Structures are given as structure tokens and as C-alpha cells.
């Protein structure tokens, strides 16, 4: 199970045992006893003893053990037997370990547990049996471990649970049954678990949930039912879980959610229904979920949004609707979501967004509409979204950006318009975006930029214009961008840059001019930290001497190549990005790198 769903307690426990005490015997030779204050260590294990609190941990992990080691001290508090070849545990094998609080048996070959295998472990709090071969567990197996707080049974082969299997475990907080083969659960499967906080049933074969299944779990906070075979969620199935805060239903086969399916979940904060087959949402799908903060509905088959679907979700902060089949956003589609901060609608089939569709979303900070085919956006469509700071419109078939499209977005920081097939942006289209920091116009079909396109964008730091069809840039086009830090105009058709184009960009540090048709360039401003020049037909005559001198004096700013940083164990052969300044003329130096030309070549200059 991932740490997002209940693993935090386990992680903290593991750290505490690993860090036990000031005296560690793990580095001693096998069989070497501890110092005088500590008990002897089994020959095949290593031990860690903390004499301040009189706690002993015995580590017998990954020793190819086929039976339990002899001589485990009776006062052991933590015993690690994971990653061995134990196929069975004899009855009463731990009868002399009454102080044991932590037992790790995961990653072994256990096919079953004898009914009395855990006899004597009345103080055991954490039991890990994950990644074994367990097919069934007899009633009474856990009768000798009344203090259990965490029980890990994930990644076994359990196909059924007996009624009353967990009876008597009133102290259990965390039960992980994920990644087994459970297809049906009896009504009384969890009887006796009145104190349970987290229940993981992910990765099984459950196709049906009956309301009686969760009766008696009034303290449950987190329920993970992801990656099963559920086809529908019926009414009242969770009605007896008043304290549930997180419910994971993602990656099932859910096609229908009944009205009232989530009734009673007054404490619910997180609901994940993503990666299912939900085709529609009714107005009474989410009533009563007044505390819900996160709702994930991405990767379904939702074709439309009914009015008032979300009207009860007054405190919702994140709504994910990406990768559905929504074709239109009508006026007030999100009424009631006044606290929403993140809205994703990417990769739907949106062709039309009505003016007023986003009315009421006064707190939205991030909106993703990418991967649709909007073709055009009405003027004022984003009005009222004054707190929006990131707007994603990549791959949205926009074609043109008209004046007032972004009216009202006074707080916008990042605007992503990549891969839209844009052939034009009208001069006043970006006016009013005084707080904009990043503008991405990559991979469009722009042939020119209006003179005053960037008027009022005095805070812009990142401007990305690569992979367009720009043949020229007006001399005053970048004048307002006095805070520009990063400028990318690579992969265009630029033949020359006006001498004054970069004059006002005193803070520019990154400039990418690769793959254009430039023949000459005077490096400016002086503070450049990275300048990319590869892929241009450079005329290495006198006008280029200043560039040659700059490149030689600043090799880190104009590197000949950059090697990609490789991380992890699966590193491929090094990848190099080259930054050649290859001369196309005069003929006598064609094919040479500008930096390799000597002073004699420029003597006539």
C-alpha cells in the first residue's frame, strides 16, 4: 500500500525501530553476544539494545531461514523475520516472547498460519504478514493478540474471510487486506473492529458492497476500495461511517452512482471516483457532503454537467473532471463552489464554453482546459476569476486570440497557450494581465507579433516563442519586458534581430536562438548566463567578432555542449545537447566553429 493511504504510522514505526538506542550490535559477527548490559544475540541475527529504556530489537531479515532461529531473548520487543523462506510457524512458537510488540514476517513463503501460531503474544501491537502465500486464515488465529494496533495482510492469496476472524481486536487501528483475491466479503467480516481507523481493500476482486459490511466501524477514517471490480455504488452503503474522511473508489468499473450513495458521510474530506465508467452525475449524487475538500472524477465517461450537481459542496477546494466526454459548459455549471481553488477540465470534448460558465468561482487559482477543441473563446468568458494565477489552454484548437478574451484575469501569473495552431494574436489580447510572469506560446503558427502585444506585461519573466514561423521581431516588441529572465525564440525563421530588440532586457539570463536563419548577432545584454546558437547559418566575418570574443570569454554561458544529468539506476548512455556556432560563410571557414577561428581571421576588422 502506498504511504498516501495509511502508511505514515508504519513509516514512523520503522524509523523508530531502526534508530533504537545508543548501542547497536548489528555490526558484530553472527553469534557475537552484546555487551555485558545486553542479552545474547541469536547466531544468525543481529541485535540492537537500548539500555536506557531496556528495549531489544532482533534483526533476522534476509537470512534464508527455513525455521525460526533458536535463542531469541525473552525480552525482545521487536523481531524482524522478513524476506526469509519460512513456510510455516509452529504452534506456540513465540510463547516465550510475551514482551514482543513488533513482529515482521513479510516477504516469506507462509502458506498458512496455525491457529495457535501467535500464542503468547498478548502485547503484540504491530504484525506484518504482507507478501506471503496465505490463502486462508482460521477463526481464532488472532485470539492471542488482543493488543494489535496494525495488521498487514496485503499481497497474499486470500480469497475469503471467515465471519468473526478479527473478533477481539478492539484495539486495531489499521487493517491492510489489499492486493489479495477477495471477491465476496461476509456481512460480519469486520465484526469486533470498533476502533478501526484505516481499512485497505484495494487491489482485490470485489464486485459488490452490502450496507451491513461496514456496520460497527463508526471510528473508521480512511477506506480504500480502489482497483476492484465494483460496477455500481448503491444508496446508504456507507451510511454507518460517520467519521470517514477519505474514500478511495478509483480504478473500478463503476458506471452508476445511486442517489444517496454517500449519505451519512458528514466528515468526508476526500472522495476519489477517478478511472471508472461513470457516464453522468445526478443533482442528488453529492448531497450532504458539506465538508468535502477534494473530488476526483477524472478518467470517466461524463458527457455533461447538470445544473446544481455540486451546489452542496460549499467547501470543495479541488475538482478534477479531466479525461471525460464533456462537450459544453453551460452558464453557472459550477454554482456553489465558492471555495474551489483547482479545477481541471483537460482532455474532454469541449467545443463551447458559455459566458458565465465559471460564475461564482471567485477563489479558483488553477484552471486546466487543455486538450479540448475550443476553437474560440468568447470575450469576458473568464471574468470574475480575479484570483486565477495559472490557466492551461494547451492543445485547444484556438486558432486566434481576440481582444478581451482574458479580461478580468488581473491576478494571472502563468498562461499556457502551447500547441494551439495559433496564426494570430490581436494587439490588445494580453492587456490587463499586469501580474503575468510566464507566457508559453510554443508550437504554434505565428508569423508575426503586433508591436504592442506585450504592452503592460512589465512583470513577465518567462517568454516562450519557440517552434513558430516568426521571420522577424519588431524592434520595440520586447520593450515592456524589463524583468524578462528567460527568452526562447528557437525553431523559428528569424533572419536578423534588430539591434535594439534586447536593449531593455537588462535582467535577461537565458536566451535561446537555436535553429533560425540568423547570420549575425551581437551578444547583449552583458549578464547572459546561457546563450544557445546552434543551427544558424552564421556569417563568420567581421560583424561576428564580438560574438566570438563573448563566447571565448564566457565558456559557461556559451558551452560547446551540455550533458544531460542522469539520475537513478536505469541511466542510459549520456545525452549531449550541442551548441555549435558553425560558420556557413565566408567559404574559407565554412564548416568551422566560430570559436576556433584565430585572431588572424579577424585582423582586417
From Swiss-Prot:
SS bond list: 41-47, 45-60, 540-583, 542-605, 566-571
Subcellular location: Secreted, Extracellular space
Span of domain LRRNT: 32-74
GO biological process, one term: cell adhesion
UniProtKB keywords: Cell adhesion, Disulfide bond, Glycoprotein, Leucine-rich repeat, Repeat, Secreted, Signal
Annotated ranges, domain LRRCT: 536-605
SUPFAM superfamilies named among the record's database cross-references: L domain-like
Signal peptide: 1-27
InterPro entries, sorted: Cys-rich_flank_reg_C, Dev_Immune_Receptor, Leu-rich_rpt, Leu-rich_rpt_typical-subtyp, LRR_dom_sf, LRRNT
Function: Involved in protein-protein interactions that result in protein complexes, receptor-ligand binding or cell adhesion.
UniProt name for this protein: Insulin-like growth factor-binding protein complex acid labile subunit
Source species: Papio hamadryas (Hamadryas baboon)
Gene: IGFALS
Amino acid at each position: 500500500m502506498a504511504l498516501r493511504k495509511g502508511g505514515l504510522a508504519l513509516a514512523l514505526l520503522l524509523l523508530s525501530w531502526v534508530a533504537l538506542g545508543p548501542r547497536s550490535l548489528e555490526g558484530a559477527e553472527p553469534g557475537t553476544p552484546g555487551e555485558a548490559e545486553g542479552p545474547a544475540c541469536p547466531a544468525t541475527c543481529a541485535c540492537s539494545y537500548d539500555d536506557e529504556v531496556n528495549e531489544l530489537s532482533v534483526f533476522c531479515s534476509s537470512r534464508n531461514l527455513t525455521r525460526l532461529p533458536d535463542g531469541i531473548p525473552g525480552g525482545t520487543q521487536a523481531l524482524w523475520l522478513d524476506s526469509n523462506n519460512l513456510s510455516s510457524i509452529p504452534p506456540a512458537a513465540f510463547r516465550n516472547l510475551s514482551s514482543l510488540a513488533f513482529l515482521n514476517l513479510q516477504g516469506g513463503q507462509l502458506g498458512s498460519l496455525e491457529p495457535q501460531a501467535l500464542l503468547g503474544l498478548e502485547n503484540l501491537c504491530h504484525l506484518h504478514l504482507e507478501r506471503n502465500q496465505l490463502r486462508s486464515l482460521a477463526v481464532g488465529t488472532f485470539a492471542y493478540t488482543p493488543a494489535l494496533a496494525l495488521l498487514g495482510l496485503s499481497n497474499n492469496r486470500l480469497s475469503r474471510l471467515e465471519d468473526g476472524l478479527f473478533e477481539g481486536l478492539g484495539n486495531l487501528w489499521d487493517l491492510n487486506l489489499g492486493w489479495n483475491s477477495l471477491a465476496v466479503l461476509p456481512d460480519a467480516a469486520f465484526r469486533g473492529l470498533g476502533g478501526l481507523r484505516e481499512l485497505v481493500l484495494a487491489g482485490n476482486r470485489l464486485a459488490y458492497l452490502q450496507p451491513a459490511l461496514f456496520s460497527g466501524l463508526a471510528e473508521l477514517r480512511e477506506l480504500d476500495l480502489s482497483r476492484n471490480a465494483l460496477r455500481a455504488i448503491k444508496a446508504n452503503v456507507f451510511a454507518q461511517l460517520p467519521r470517514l474522511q477519505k474514500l478511495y473508489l478509483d480504478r473500478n468499473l463503476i458506471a452508476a452512482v445511486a442517489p444517496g450513495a454517500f449519505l451519512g458521510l458528514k466528515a468526508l474530506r476526500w472522495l476519489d471516483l477517478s478511472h471508472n465508467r461513470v457516464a453522468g452525475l445526478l443533482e442528488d449524487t453529492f448531497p450532504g457532503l458539506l465538508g468535502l475538500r477534494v473530488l476526483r472524477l477524472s478518467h470517466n465517461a461524463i458527457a455533461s454537467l447538470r445544473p446544481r450537481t455540486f451546489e452542496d459542496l460549499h467547501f470543495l477546494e479541488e475538482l478534477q473532471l479531466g479525461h471525460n466526454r464533456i462537450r459544453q459548459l453551460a452558464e453557472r455549471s459550477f454554482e456553489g463552489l465558492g471555495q474551489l481553488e483547482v479545477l481541471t477540465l483537460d482532455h474532454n470534448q469541449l467545443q463551447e464554453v458559455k459566458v458565465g460558465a465559471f460564475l461564482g468561482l471567485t477563489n479558483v487559482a488553477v484552471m486546466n482546459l487543455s486538450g479540448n477543441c475550443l476553437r474560440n473563446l468568447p470575450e469576458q468568458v473568464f471574468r470574475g476569476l480575479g484570483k486565477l494565477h495559472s490557466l492551461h489552454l494547451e492543445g485547444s484548437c484556438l486558432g486566434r486570440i481576440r481582444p478581451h478574451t482574458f479580461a478580468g484575469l488581473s491576478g494571472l501569473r502563468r498562461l499556457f497557450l502551447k500547441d494551439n495552431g495559433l496564426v494570430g494574436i490581436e494587439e490588445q489580447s494580453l492587456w490587463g494581465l499586469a501580474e503575468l510572469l510566464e507566457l508559453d506560446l510554443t508550437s504554434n503558427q505565428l508569423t508575426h507579433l503586433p508591436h504592442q502585444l506585450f504592452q503592460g506585461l512589465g512583470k513577465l519573466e518567462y517568454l516562450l516563442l519557440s517552434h513558430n514561423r516568426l521571420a522577424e521581431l519588431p524592434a520595440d516588441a520586447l520593450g515592456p519586458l524589463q524583468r524578462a529572465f528567460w527568452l526562447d525564440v528557437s525553431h523559428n525563421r528569424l533572419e536578423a534581430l534588430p539591434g535594439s530588440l534586447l536593449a531593455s532586457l537588462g535582467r535577461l539570463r537565458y536566451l535561446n536562438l537555436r535553429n533560425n536563419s540568423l547570420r549575425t548577432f551581437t551578444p547583449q545584454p552583458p549578464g547572459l548566463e546561457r546563450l544557445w546558437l546552434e543551427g544558424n547559418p552564421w556569417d563568420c566575418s567581421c560583424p561576428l567578432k564580438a560574438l566570438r570574443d563573448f563566447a571565448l570569454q564566457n565558456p559557461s554561458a556559451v558551452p560547446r555542449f551540455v550533458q544531460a544529468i542522469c539520475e537513478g539506476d536505469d541511466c542510459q548512455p549520456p545525452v549531449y545537447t550541442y551548441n555549435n556556432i558553425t560558420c556557413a560563410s565566408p567559404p574559407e571557414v565554412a564548416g568551422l566553429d566560430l570559436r576556433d577561428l584565430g585572431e588572424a581571421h579577424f585582423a582586417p576588422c
